[in-house]
């Protein structure tokens, strides 16, 4: 089993698909990596030579931000938005949708389960 960027790639999958198991690499990035390293995208992971695995590993380490580094960068970006107090930062802080979705109804995923409020007696 090939291990790249701390992720074990599934042996039975094609390399193009297997690389997408790494956080931060999707299909387009996977295709760019394979064309840059000269590895055939239809090859199965189990059929990769040690040399090809090393090529992929080096290329990903040098050029693509993946796994922990990417997660850290994303969380730092969100913290920065919250610190400067911009609209997006405020929405993150309050746990509301950030990208302009309606929140009067819906938005339950972001807001969490309903907190029922007792009726006021007359």
Swiss-Prot record:
Domain of life where this protein originates: Bacteria
Pfam name, any one: Ribosomal_S13
Keyword tRNA-binding: yes
GO CC entries: cytosol; small ribosomal subunit
UniProt GO MF annotations: rRNA binding; structural constituent of ribosome; tRNA binding
Region of interest (Disordered), residue spans: 95-122
Entry keyword annotation includes NAD: no
Gene3D superfamilies named among the record's database cross-references: 1.10.8.50, 30s ribosomal protein s13, domain 2
A Gene Ontology biological process term: translation
Keywords noted in UniProt: Ribonucleoprotein, Ribosomal protein, RNA-binding, rRNA-binding, tRNA-binding
PANTHER family: 30S RIBOSOMAL PROTEIN S13/40S RIBOSOMAL PROTEIN S18, SMALL RIBOSOMAL SUBUNIT PROTEIN US13M
Described purpose of this protein according to its UniProt entry: Located at the top of the head of the 30S subunit, it contacts several helices of the 16S rRNA. In the 70S ribosome it contacts the 23S rRNA (bridge B1a) and protein L5 of the 50S subunit (bridge B1b), connecting the 2 subunits; these bridges are implicated in subunit movement. Contacts the tRNAs in the A and P-sites.
Subunit structure: Part of the 30S ribosomal subunit. Forms a loose heterodimer with protein S19. Forms two bridges to the 50S subunit in the 70S ribosome.
Family membership: Belongs to the universal ribosomal protein uS13 family.
Protein name per Swiss-Prot or TrEMBL: Small ribosomal subunit protein uS13
Native source organism of the sequence: Brevibacillus brevis (strain 47 / JCM 6285 / NBRC 100599)
Lineage, opening ranks: Bacteria, Bacillati, Bacillota, Bacilli, Bacillales
């Amino acid at each position: 089993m090939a291990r790249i960027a701390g992720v074990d790639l599934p042996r039975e999958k094609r390399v193009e698909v297997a690389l997408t198991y790494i956080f931060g690499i999707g299909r387009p990035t996977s295709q760019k990596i394979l064309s840059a390293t000269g590895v055939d995208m239809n090859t199965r992971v189990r059929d990769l030579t040690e040399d090809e695995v090393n090529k992929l590993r080096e290329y990903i380490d040098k050029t693509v931000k993946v796994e922990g580094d990417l997660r850290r960068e994303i969380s730092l970006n969100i913290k920065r938005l919250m610190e400067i107090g911009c609209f997006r930062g405020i929405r993150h802080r309050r746990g509301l949708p950030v990208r302009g979705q309606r929140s009067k109804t819906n938005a339950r995923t972001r807001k969490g389960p309903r907190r029922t409020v007792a009726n006021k007696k007359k």
